């Protein structure tokens, strides 16, 4: 099994980024970069909401969290100078991005909810946390609890919530992807999510093999933001 080496910047000194804040500028940029990949089509609108009693609500402008989220949602990494012109670029692309107070409490200090809509009618809701020093975590995707921190490829397989099927599916997936970094499952009503963590992306053959398992509604891939 192969492993990535730690980065002296991201893991020891601090993130390579456009500032001013690792938690409130770099973190949001990484969150936006990760969340954007949950849409199969082009981003049309994003609503970023902050917990009413959280850290973002009174500082997101001063700490340029709004620039960070916007830049990441447009596909830029936190070290990109494009962060400075994020709003201008969003306007050029006809992408509407709103920032507002949410109706939820801060279960963690830097809790944010992102609701993303594509130009083809897709919609996805993500809860996220900027955990400090530029590190982040996606906590929930469309009602499924997850732990996505951006350090590997996250393969998200949406399927039926059936215990026997899930056990068999995970067994098959484990045989297909013997080099995985781990599996996690989450349920929401009648639906389930299988999350495979890998150090490499999927090939077209890999995707075809997953679909052959049956009862697969969707497959989404999040590429890492940490390197």
Language-model features and meaning:
Residues 68, 99, 127-227:
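A conserved regulatory-domain signal marking ACT and ACT-like small-molecule sensing domains
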Residues 1-9, 40-45:
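Acidic-glycine-rich active-site phosphate/pyrophosphate-binding loop
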């Amino acid at each position: 099994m192969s492993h990535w080496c730690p980065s002296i910047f991201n893991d020891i000194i601090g993130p390579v980024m456009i500032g001013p804040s690792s938690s409130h500028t770099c973190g949001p940029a990484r969150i936006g970069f990760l969340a954007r990949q949950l849409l199969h089509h082009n981003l049309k609108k994003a609503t970023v909401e902050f917990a009413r009693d959280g850290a973002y609500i009174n500082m997101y402008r001063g700490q340029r969290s709004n620039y960070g989220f916007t830049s990441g949602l447009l596909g830029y990494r936190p070290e990109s100078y494009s962060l400075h012109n994020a709003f201008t670029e969003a306007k050029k692309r006809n992408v509407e991005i709103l920032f507002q107070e949410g109706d939820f409490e801060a279960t963690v200090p830097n809790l944010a909810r992102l609701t993303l809509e594509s130009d083809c009618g897709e919609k996805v809701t993500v809860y996220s946390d900027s955990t400090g020093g530029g590190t982040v975590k996606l906590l929930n995707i469309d009602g499924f609890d997850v732990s996505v921190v951006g350090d590997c490829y996250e393969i998200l397989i949406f399927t039926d919530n059936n215990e026997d099927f899930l056990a068999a599916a995970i067994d098959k997936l484990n045989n297909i992807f013997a080099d995985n970094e781990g599996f996690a499952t989450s349920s929401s009503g009648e639906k389930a999510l299988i999350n495979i963590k890998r150090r490499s992306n999927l090939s077209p053959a890999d995707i075809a093999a997953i679909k052959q398992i049956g009862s697969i509604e969707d497959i989404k891939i999040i590429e890492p933001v940490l390197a």
